[in-house]
């Protein structure tokens, strides 16, 4: 009789233990939030984009970061501004063959057709390549037509990242149209370009899906540190266009004595030092080139590290010298 009661008591204790057992801990928020979950969660999570994984990826590919949309994006890409025709197609194919897995284009560049062709002809599965494009302000009044045009010209099934190219009238209207395409699965992530502290702070409360990335002019002569830190604090990635100076200013930057000295000490080019400096600040880069040697050079930046002293010397080069009109 006593034995029977003991067995019953043990069974009850066992049931209670099972019902209150803790679930094994989850390593990170990205383990449980999928891209589909994040579509309607503009706060998703506050990512730390101030530090990147800086070791070369598999087969020479650039490492990736997890965007707040739940998708992964390479931290080095090919910029295609000024690339046209077969030169653009071949540059995209060359970049992909050398390990690039991110390609940046825009309606304003006039080369979405060529970029799409380069991606399709690369021989690399579509899902391994991250393609970003941008709507221009003159498209914001009829954004649905503009988005459909981008999809048609690229002809790659879906767009990994679509950005607003500049602030402007109807930019919120255009972004809200982009949000609809995210929910429909035709665009995966959204971003903005040329948005600084006031612009991004005014913009965020007006939209549903949080931008994953802000693309701004950034180079050693215009480091924009306050803006970079502010955007990082919002859990948004930062990307540099004009990382090497741009529009008539590249030669001066690439011959800067401080940068030349640092480059020589590492056996690297000045361009490689600048790109590495960006990455060590947590800034994504999209250098452009049609020269296969330069394209290869621009992704060969994962086998050296700038010292704290070198990073400080480059920081001292800041002139607040902005080279673009916006």
Name each model-derived stretch.
Residues 6-14:
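Bacterial N-terminal signal peptides
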Residues 144-164, 180-184:
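CE4/NodB-like, metal-dependent polysaccharide N-deacetylase domain
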Residues 126-139, 160-167:
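A short, structured active-site edge motif that brings together acidic residues
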Residues 83-86, 104-114, 136-142, 167-171, ...:
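Acidic-and-aromatic substrate-binding clefts and catalytic sites of carbohydrate-active enzymes
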Residues 83-96, 139-155, 198-201:
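Short, acidic/polar
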Residues 21-129, 244-246:
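N-terminal binding-site loop/beta-alpha segment at the start of enzyme catalytic domains
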Residues 54, 166-326:
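Beta/alpha (TIM)-barrel catalytic core signal, keyed to glycine-rich beta->alpha loops juxtaposed to Asp/Glu
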